[in-house]
Amino acid sequence: MEPYILQDEELNELVVKIPGWEIKSKQIQREFNFANFIEAFAFMTKVALICEKYNHHPNWENVYAKVIIKLNTHDLGGITNLDQTLASEINKIFDQ
């Protein structure tokens, strides 16, 4: 997949199509909450496997049962179709 920067209209569609994600400072971000650390870490492990598949890696934080994921494409300096795809895949994992 060749990444390209999403335009304003595409970004507006992204936050509607992919629930829970917000646009903040040239990145998309979502907070995920779990019952405990084990569930949070299991989620992160599943996400890591998808990230490797796309060779695209998030900035993320984990504090006990909370995971915050931030996506952007550093090489292009903004939010791309690759970030959109990864956000959608991450939501699928969370919804399982």
Curated annotation (Swiss-Prot):
Presence of the UniProt keyword Lyase in the record: yes
One annotated GO biological process: tetrahydrobiopterin biosynthetic process
Catalytic activity, EC: 4.2.1.96
Keywords: Lyase
Gene Ontology MF terms: 4-alpha-hydroxytetrahydrobiopterin dehydratase activity
Keyword Lyase appears in the UniProt entry: yes
InterPro entries: PCD_sf, Pterin_deHydtase
Enzymatic reactions: (4aS,6R)-4a-hydroxy-L-erythro-5,6,7,8-tetrahydrobiopterin = (6R)-L-erythro-6,7-dihydrobiopterin + H2O
NCBIfam families on file: PRK00823.1-2, PRK00823.1-3
Family the UniProt entry places it in: Belongs to the pterin-4-alpha-carbinolamine dehydratase family.
Name this polypeptide is given: Putative pterin-4-alpha-carbinolamine dehydratase
